[in-house]
Amino acid sequence: MTGPVNLTAYFSNAWIAVAPAAFSYGPAILQVFPDAGSQAGGDTLYLFGFGFGTSPGSLTLTIGGAAATVQKVESLPSFASALSLDATYPFSLERITVTTPPGSPGKADISITASSGHATAPKYFQYLNASATFPRSGLYKFLLNDPLRQQVYLSATDHVDVFDRTAQAFRSPIEPPPNGPPPDAGLRGLALTPDGSQLIVADFGAQSVYLISPDGGANNGAQVPVGGVPGYANSGPARVAATSAATVFVGLSGEGGSTGGCNSCLGQMDLTASPPTLEPAPQPEVTSLTGAPLLQADSAGDTVYLAFGTAPGGPVAQWTAAAPNAFTVSSANDSSSDLSTSADGTLFAMRSMNATEIRGPDLSLFSTPVSAELEAIPGRVSVPGVALHPSGALLYDPFLDGPPPSAPPAQGIRGGIDIRDAHSGRLRLRSYLPEPFAMLSADVDGLHGNFLTTDENGEYLFALTTSGLTVIQLASMPLGIGSLSPASGAAAGGASITIRGSGFQSSTKATLGGKSANVTFKDANTLLMTTPVLSAGPQQLILSNPDGESVSLDAAFVAQ
């Protein structure tokens, strides 16, 4: 027997007392935070578990076979406040603080040898492929990945900086057309048309939207004045979403008091008109909705999800290219503060009162990820920029471990990213950034900033941090399930199913309804599966990789 066991005391009066996990046969590692770090080493990790002993000198700990430096060993009372645990917490938990050694990119085992024995936590830590900050002076608030050109756009106050992903260097910035930045410029949200030919930029300060060719050249763009919102001291466009119907939805925001609710904060721009002009969105389902909308389109521009956090009932909405003259609206009763859409358009994430919700294409809520006790970070602040893996399998949740400053520089705080399973909410990976996010205390929601995005495969993470752009490249993507298409079929089997997700390998295996299913690898985010003979009803899908990693999704497929 190894690991923690309960202690039970039996009394002559028939009473018993139980101390859960009060004794451990040798060391046992429960969790490690963070569980991703630089291949150069030097990161501080916290290992939680049992049977570690009391002296750092009596422990030997290795990560990927290389010796780590043990800083200290603590029993629960000394670190309870760091996890917001009180005296009612029943387990005799222990914590080791270590400094990571250098390592090779990929998953690594953590092994510990104590006077009481030895234990190994297989694949518990990931050395990142890359983690670097590229300095650039600017008050950045929003960023956008361009998969066609392999570029990242960063909106500064009066221009858009361009980061070349291949060269890992900044290129010449893009200035607002036609004659450079106006004196009152205040750039915010960014979007690309589905074909990538135009970069759409919202200028809150100048109350304009810019249509720009990212390739540059003469006459490479146009300015479309959109005006502000009556009754507000400051107002203008904050978010934009381009569609496959050659339209752009514009979310306007008002700040500094109002004489009434905003009844025209969702606008629609026709890109085929010359010149393009903005009008209030004409669809009857949204004409009566008030408040500044958060909005984002999928990569094809076929679906746009919206959230009206200040409107009565806190509604969410969906627009589709299949029915461009109508919206689907549902009352969510949420005070939404951030929103992100998966590139596939199969689901969207939104923040409400510091909780993150995952909703499906029918706008229904199916997941609200929460932190387990040991995952909690006291003083955690959500950073605008919640993101989804392109398939919808994973949620990228940016945070600070303390309040952001009112003005630069940020001191005494760290920035990090939690990667969670979008369906179950389970924490799959936590990584800290080399420096904090560039969030300021005024950046209260997704109308004021979007500090995190991913590449087209969810492998590269791009973060706006205090001195520029931080780029993280994961060495191993967490295995995840995003969606199945179609999600139902004949119980007789033989149906061809496309599985979208993350972390797929050529040797990934699948079981559906407890039966092995034939799988063909297409790419790291796509599998083709042939269904086996099944019983009628909903079926659980389980995917597994050769290193033992597995993930499941209940009712993933309905056999009919």
Regions found by a protein language model. Give the residues of each.
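Beta-strand/beta-sandwich contexts
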Residues: 14-59, 68-71, 75-82, 117-140, ...
